[in-house]
UniProtKB/Swiss-Prot annotation:
Alphabetized Pfam families for the sequence: UPF0102
Family listed: Belongs to the UPF0102 family.
Transmembrane intervals: none
SUPFAM superfamilies: Restriction endonuclease-like
Organism field: Alcanivorax borkumensis (strain ATCC 700651 / DSM 11573 / NCIMB 13689 / SK2)
Gene Ontology MF, one: nucleic acid binding
The protein, known as: UPF0102 protein ABO_0585
Length: 125
């Protein structure tokens, strides 16, 4: 898969790469790009019985703290609210434990993609 080029398609391409990489790690996709008024969740996956709400972040370089530093408290709150909305719409998942992951993606010096997967990146209070 060529490295991300078009600014317009960067987010979509990053999410496709992330989905492929995470399924390679043994997770299965439940939903992509869940949208609601409260926010958006890039990927919702199952890790065995755990429902995983995943934020995907792509950065060209780390000059602004990298991909993971961009998930601030405001973004975390929006993800938590969107996850609550998802669970309200999908009662079949109510029994599952949930977690919030962040998958950072950045090019290395040879333009290959480096993945940094933070499981349980933050918690809902």
């Amino acid at each position: 898969m060529p490295l991300l080029r078009s600014k317009k398609n960067t987010g979509r391409d990053a999410e496709k790469r992330a989905a492929k990489w995470l399924t390679g790690q043994g997770l299965s996709i439940v939903e992509r790009n869940f949208h609601c008024r409260q926010g958006e969740i890039d990927l919702i996956l199952l890790d065995q019985e755990t429902l995983v709400f995943t934020e995907v972040r792509w950065r060209k370089h780390q000059s602004y703290g990298g991909a993971l530093a961009s998930v601030d408290q405001h973004k975390q709150r929006r993800l938590i609210n969107a996850a609550q909305h998802f669970l309200a719409r999908h009662p079949e998942h109510h029994h599952r434990p949930c977690r919030f992951d962040v998958l950072g993606m950045e090019p290395d010096s040879q333009q290959a993609v480096l993945y940094q997967w933070i499981q349980n990146a933050f918690y809902s209070e």
